[in-house]
Amino acid sequence: MTEAPHTVKSYEEELKNLNSNIIKMGGFCEEALGKAIQAITTRNSDNAEAVIKDDEKIDKFETLIEQQVVNLIALRQPMAIDLRETVTALKISSDLEIIGDLAKNISKRTLLLNENLPKNLVDAIIRVSSDVQKQLKSILDAYLERSSSMAINVWESDEQIDDLTNLCMQEVIRYLKDNENNLSDGTHLLFVTKNIERIGDHTTNIAEQVYYLVKGEYLEGDRPKGTEPIVTGEK
């Protein structure tokens, strides 16, 4: 049975505004991640400081979206597809806020590094972060286009992110062995790598929500995972 569209024009505008804010928030997260990765791979402190400063914008969007959802549910009492729209927006904004926090943490640790990174380690970070950046862009496009197939592609790519993360971890461990007097930098790099992977995990969370939004049901089966991670991360 086809779900009947709502008829209140102002309500439709409110939903459009909610969707627009999700896309804007996602855009800020994309920008933060890009700057954070550039900061650590090129030791660009200006980019790192910009990510830390601009995280407040992402936090404000989460608060705004949360208030919009509360108002929509309380005043409009949405049903069916409209209820999925509002609930999904709330969950996606939560994941985006965490992605912003993780980008900020990468930037904070970048500012604490004492030495320039060897090329092999920079290359490993770029490989995994490049895939995560593509993943984030793809899922925002999937949300915008209401594409369940794009959401599935992002969901399935999580395994590759895990594997690239562990390759990066191996490079960090090699760096630690070669720089035993610089355990501080090595520790920061382990957490940077794990935070990049966690951004991928939260992007995959968004993929599950987009699929639910479009299909009205959750993805079946266990989330694809790569090899076991070496260390745990942080928010």
Regions from the language model: what does each represent?
Residues 1-235:
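Cytosolic, long alpha-helical scaffolding segments
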